[in-house]
Curated annotation (Swiss-Prot):
The keyword Phosphoprotein is annotated on this UniProt entry: yes
Domain comment in the entry: The BTB/POZ domain mediates the interaction with some component of ubiquitin ligase complexes.
Keyword Coiled coil: yes
Compositional bias (Polar residues): 507-521
Official protein name in the record: BTB/POZ domain-containing protein At5g48800
An individual GO BP term: protein ubiquitination
Top-level taxon of origin: Eukaryota
Coiled coil: 522-562
Pfam annotation, one family: NPH3
Length: 614
């Protein structure tokens, strides 16, 4: 009750203030009129405008205003003494200026009052038909010769015209100011472009690449336009696009306008967001991607039209490689029990990213197969893959996240998008840790997403001991670890003897985990455990073997260095013998010890090599 009573008192207070303002306006109007009307001639007509009364004389008014002349003529018999002018544009303040003009009182026409005076001259019919150099022609001249030559004045007139619609539009005040703004902005940019032209050392004319501060590129008008109402701002932007203003300038203006208007609470927020989205240039990267994500968040909160959100999602998908993890974390505002973040919106953005340039999909695949990491499409794909894996890891602990939605995000990119599956494995492990009640079939669905051959050594070692993974997946990890170790052995020691037949058979007998359909689940489980133990033993043996080979490889390098030094000394002695001062050549005698020494060293090396391979 106290709250409602307080609101009632506030309402009464506002009504009292509004009534007091009307009385003050009427009183001030009467006081101001008494300062410039004919004091020695009594008033014969009272004009009422929005609650304000003006005690005036018929003759000055009817000599300039066709409307008042007609009203007085229609009531000549009754000798009318009071006229109420309803819906007069600009209100009492503007009428006072028009009345002064009728009385020949000088006042200044400015960009702050020209729109009101232009409209009131039309309302009162103050045209050349009734008097030469009337108010209509005076305001027309000022608008055309002064306002339309200056961009800031045009913006100010548009701002003043907001309360004069639709009359200001019908009188073409709005249209002329918008055209003037677009023309001036385009001319400023052309002039700025010419100012950046310079001659190179070769004498050719080119555009300077010097980065200029804000306002030096003919974009100083951006802040000025932010004061306009959204409907007029939209018309100005469309006119600028038609005139050829740079997309970067349009984008910068949209960012400035959104930062000004969307930071304050307004009932027109939804309209503002939807309008800004329609005004976005078609070119990419003309506005920051964080700005687009901010618009999308507002669009979700304000429940804008479907077309607005789909347009934003399409734009974001086309430049998703520029996004960060914070950009993707769009809060969900639907209902209780839903996920913390909006998964469906992110999925649609990923679909847009995957489908962009669909006509070039074959070319992309061919480039990928040719292993060209410098391809821009590949670079973008790899960046987005890392971003998606980070996003999956962020949303994985959410208890309300269904497996189907997790799979939806994880499978949104093509298989070749990930060259390394460490990030995906980490996200899946976090999901398994947070959702321990998953069935074995659900765990297998998650594990199938991972290509265990694309795990790093650290991730593979972690996965081999991860009890949250299905046993079949652990077997696959161990199997691929075995293959990697064998490959490492072959590359580090190319002269290794062929593998024993029994070892080869054992390696190939351990398959990738595919189980026979004819075996019972109990036998399958026992078989997997057995293969798991065998793989672990095999891996342990291979690691020991690899360590031994690395040690022997170091010893062999030392022996080779020693052998090389002995061979060098022998060759040096041989050459010195040929250069004997006595003129005798005993090459046979001098070379034989050298050869014998080399044979001895080679024999030692071969024995060590054979011993190491055994």
């Amino acid at each position: 009750m106290d709250k409602h009573h307080h609101q009632h008192l506030l309402l009464q207070h506002h009504q009292h203030l509004h009534h007091h303002q009307k009385l003050s306006l009427a009183k001030s109007s009467r006081q101001s009129c008494s300062e410039w009307i004919f004091r020695d001639v009594p008033s014969d007509i009272t004009i009422e405008v929005n609650g304000g009364n003006f005690a005036l004389h018929k003759f000055p008014l009817v000599s300039r205003s066709g409307r008042i002349r007609r009203i007085v003529a229609e009531h000549r018999d009754s000798d009318i003494s009071k006229v109420e002018l309803l819906n007069l544009p600009g209100g009492a303040e503007t009428f006072e200026l028009a009345a002064k003009f009728c009385y020949g009182i000088n006042f200044e026409i400015t960009s702050s009052n020209v729109a009101q005076l232009f409209c009131v001259s039309d309302y009162l019919e103050m045209t050349e038909e009734y008097s030469k150099d009337n108010l209509a022609s005076r305001t027309e001249e000022y608008l055309e010769s002064i306002v339309c030559k200056n961009l800031e004045m045009c913006v100010q007139v548009l701002k003043q015209s907001e309360i004069l619609l639709p009359l200001a539009d019908e009188l073409n005040i709005i249209g002329r100011c918008i055209d003037a703004i677009a023309s001036k902005a385009c001319a400023e940019q052309i002039a700025s472009s010419f100012s950046r032209l310079e001659y190179s050392s070769s004498g050719r004319l080119h555009m300077s690449r010097q980065v200029k501060s804000s306002g030096d590129g003919g974009d100083w008008w951006i802040e000025d336009l932010s004061v306009l109402r959204i409907d007029l701002y939209q018309r100005v932007m469309n006119a600028m696009k038609c005139r050829g203003v740079r997309p970067e300038s349009i984008g910068a203006s949209l960012v400035s306008y959104a930062e000004r208007e969307l930071t304050k609470r307004s009932e027109h927020e939804q309209t503002i967001v939807e309008t800004i989205v329609t005004l976005l240039p078609v070119e990419n990267l003309v506005v920051p991607i964080s700005f687009l994500f901010g618009l999308l968040r507002r669009a979700v909160i304000l429940d804008t039209s479907v077309s607005c959100r789909l347009d934003l999602e399409r734009r974001l998908g086309s430049q998703l490689d520029m996004a960060t993890l914070d950009d993707l974390l769009i809060p969900s505002f639907r209902h209780a029990g839903d996920t913390l973040f909006d998964i469906d919106t992110v999925h649609r953005i990923l679909v847009n990213f995957s489908q962009q340039g669909g006509d070039d999909s074959e070319d992309e695949e061919s480039v990928f197969e040719c292993d060209s990491p410098h391809s821009p499409s590949q670079t973008a794909m790899f960046k987005v893959a890392k971003l998606v894996d980070s996003y999956l890891a962020e949303i994985a602990p959410d208890a309300n996240l269904d497996l189907s939605k997790f799979l939806l995000i994880a499978e949104a990119l093509p298989p070749h998008a990930r060259t390394l599956h460490d990030g995906l494995y980490r996200a899946i492990d976090l999901y398994l840790k947070a959702h321990q009640g998953l069935s074995d079939s659900d765990k297998k669905k998650l594990s199938k997403l991972i290509d265990f051959q694309k795990l790093s050594q650290e991730a593979g070692a972690h996965a081999a001991q991860n009890e949250r993974l299905p046993l079949q997946s652990i077997v696959q990890v161990l199997y691929f670890e075995q293959l990697k170790l064998r490959s490492s052995l072959c590359s580090s020691y190319s002269d290794e003897e062929p593998k024993p037949k029994q070892q080869q058979q054992q390696s190939w007998r351990i398959n990738s985990g595919a189980l026979s359909a004819t075996m019972s689940p109990k036998d399958n489980y026992a078989s997997l455990r057995r293969e798991n133990r065998e793989l672990k033993l095999e891996l342990a043996r291979l690691r020991m073997r690899l360590n031994d080979l690395e040690k022997e490889h170091i010893c062999m390098k030392r022996d080779m260095q020693r052998s090389h030094s002995r061979k060098f000394m022998s060759s040096f002695s041989k050459k010195m013998g040929k250069l004997s001062f006595f003129g005798h050549s005993s090459s046979r005698g001098s070379s034989s010890p050298s050869k014998q020494s080399f044979r001895t060293d080679s024999k030692v090396l071969m024995e060590r090599t054979c011993a190491s391979t055994d």
